[in-house]
C-alpha cells in the first residue's frame, strides 16, 4: 500500500486547539470493524459498551515538560525537545537552532542551568546536564508541555493538567497517550463498579509519533522506537479475560502497540515485556491480543491511522473519517474519540 492511500483533507477548524471543559464531554464515533457500521455517540456512552468481565488496558505514562529554551555559549538561541531520558543526567533530544551545537559545546538553559553536547546520533543530540539536580527536576523547573505542532499555540498553565491523563504514573513521555485524556476519575470508578477490570501498561510516547512518514510505500517506513513495559500481572489478567470469553479493550494506540509488542516478542504467546519496541502495525497485521480499542482521530498519512485501518479494515476506517469530517468531529490530541471493534480475519 502507498502512504498516500491514507490521506484525507481536513478543514483547519476541525483541529481541536483546546480540550473540552469536561474530560468526558467529547463525542464518540463507534465503528464496527466487521460491518463498518457507524454510531454517533457521546463519550460517556462508552460505559454501556464495555461489558462486565471485559479488561480495559490503559497507558500510565506521564508526560514530562519536555520543551526547553536556552542559548548556545556563542549567543545563538535554541529550543530543545527531549526525545527520551537516558538516565538522571543525560537525554536524547531534538535541537532547533540556526546552527547545530558542536560536541563539547555548552548550552545555557533558562533558569541558569547548563548542559553539554556530548554526541550526535543521526538527527538526535545527546546532552548531559551539568548540575546536582536530575533532568526531571530541571524539566519541572523550566520545561514547557510539549504540545503537538498542529495545536499551534504556546503552552498554557492549564495544559500541565489537561495534556496528562488522570492516572499518569511513570514520567517519560513527550506526547500524551491521548485516548486516555477523556477519562476522569468518576468514569473509571463507574467502569469498576460495573465489573470491568482495569490494568495498566507503560509506553513512553516519543516525539517521533508526530514525524511525518517520508516514504512512498508503507514497507519502506522505519518506525521510531519507544520504551514499553507490560508487567506479568497484566499478562495474567489478559489470559483470564480471554479464558472467560471476554474482551481486551485497549485505550489508545500506545496500549495496543505495547500489548502487541509483548506478543510479538514471544512469537504470539503473550509474556511480560520490558524494553524498546519499534512495532509498526499496518493493514495485513494479525492482532494477537486486542479485541476493541478507544482512540482519537489521527493525522492523515500517519502510522496511527494505518494501525486503526489494520484493526477495523482500511475501507471502514477511511469511510469513518469522512463521516467524522462531515459531522464536524474534533480531530487530534484534544479532539473527540472513536470506539472501534476488531474486524475478524
UniProtKB/Swiss-Prot annotation:
Main localization of the protein described in the UniProt heading: cytoplasm
Keyword vocabulary terms for this entry: Cytoplasm, Queuosine biosynthesis, S-adenosyl-L-methionine, Transferase
GO biological process terms, semicolon-separated: queuosine biosynthetic process; tRNA wobble guanine modification
GO molecular function, one term: S-adenosylmethionine:tRNA ribosyltransferase-isomerase activity
Pfam families associated with the record: Queuosine_synth
Family: Belongs to the QueA family.
Name this polypeptide is given: S-adenosylmethionine:tRNA ribosyltransferase-isomerase
Organism: Shewanella baltica (strain OS185)
Gene of this entry: queA
Amino acid at each position: 500500500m502507498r502512504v498516500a492511500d491514507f490521506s484525507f483533507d481536513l478543514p483547519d477548524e476541525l483541529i481541536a486547539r483546546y480540550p473540552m471543559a469536561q474530560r468526558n464531554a467529547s463525542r464518540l464515533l463507534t465503528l464496527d470493524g466487521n460491518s463498518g457500521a457507524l454510531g454517533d455517540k457521546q463519550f460517556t456512552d462508552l460505559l454501556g459498551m464495555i461489558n462486565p468481565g471485559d479488561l480495559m488496558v490503559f497507558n500510565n505514562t506521564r508526560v514530562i515538560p519536555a520543551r526547553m529554551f536556552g542559548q548556545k555559549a556563542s549567543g545563538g538561541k535554541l529550543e530543545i525537545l527531549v526525545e527520551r531520558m537516558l538516565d538522571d543526567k543525560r537525554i536524547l533530544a531534538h535541537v532547533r537552532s540556526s546552527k547545530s551545537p558542536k560536541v563539547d559545546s555548552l548550552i545555557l538553559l533558562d533558569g541558569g542551568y547548563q548542559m553539554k553536547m556530548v554526541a550526535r546520533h543521526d538527527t538526535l543530540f545527546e546532552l548531559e546536564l551539568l548540575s546536582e539536580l536530575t533532568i526531571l527536576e530541571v524539566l519541572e523547573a523550566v520545561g514547557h508541555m510539549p504540545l503537538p505542532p498542529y495545536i499551534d499555540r504556546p503552552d498554557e498553565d492549564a495544559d500541565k493538567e489537561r495534556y496528562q491523563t488522570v492516572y499518569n504514573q511513570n514520567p517519560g513521555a513527550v506526547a500524551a497517550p491521548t485516548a486516555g485524556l477523556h477519562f476522569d476519575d468518576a468514569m473509571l470508578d463507574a467502569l469498576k463498579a460495573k465489573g470491568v477490570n482495569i490494568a495498566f501498561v507503560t509506553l513512553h510516547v516519543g516525539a517521533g509519533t508526530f514525524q511525518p512518514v517520508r516514504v512512498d510505500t508503507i514497507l519502506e517506513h522505519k518506525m521510531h522506537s519507544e520504551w514499553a513495559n507490560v508487567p506479568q500481572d497484566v499478562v495474567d489478567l489478559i489470559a483470564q479475560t480471554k479464558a472467560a470469553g471476554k474482551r481486551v479493550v485497549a485505550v489508545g494506540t500506545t496500549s495496543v502497540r505495547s500489548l502487541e509488542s509483548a506478543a510479538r516478542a514471544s512469537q504470539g504467546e503473550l509474556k511480560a515485556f520490558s524494553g524498546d519496541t519499534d512495532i509498526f502495525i499496518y493493514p495485513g497485521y494479525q492482532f494477537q491480543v486486542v479485541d476493541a480499542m478507544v482512540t482519537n482521530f489521527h493525522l492523515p498519512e500517519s502510522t496511527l491511522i494505518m494501525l486503526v485501518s489494520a484493526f477495523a479494515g482500511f475501507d471502514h476506517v477511511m469511510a469513518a473519517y469522512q463521516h467524522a469530517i462531515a459531522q464536524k468531529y474534533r480531530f487530534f490530541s484534544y479532539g473527540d474519540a472513536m470506539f472501534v471493534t476488531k474486524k475478524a480475519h
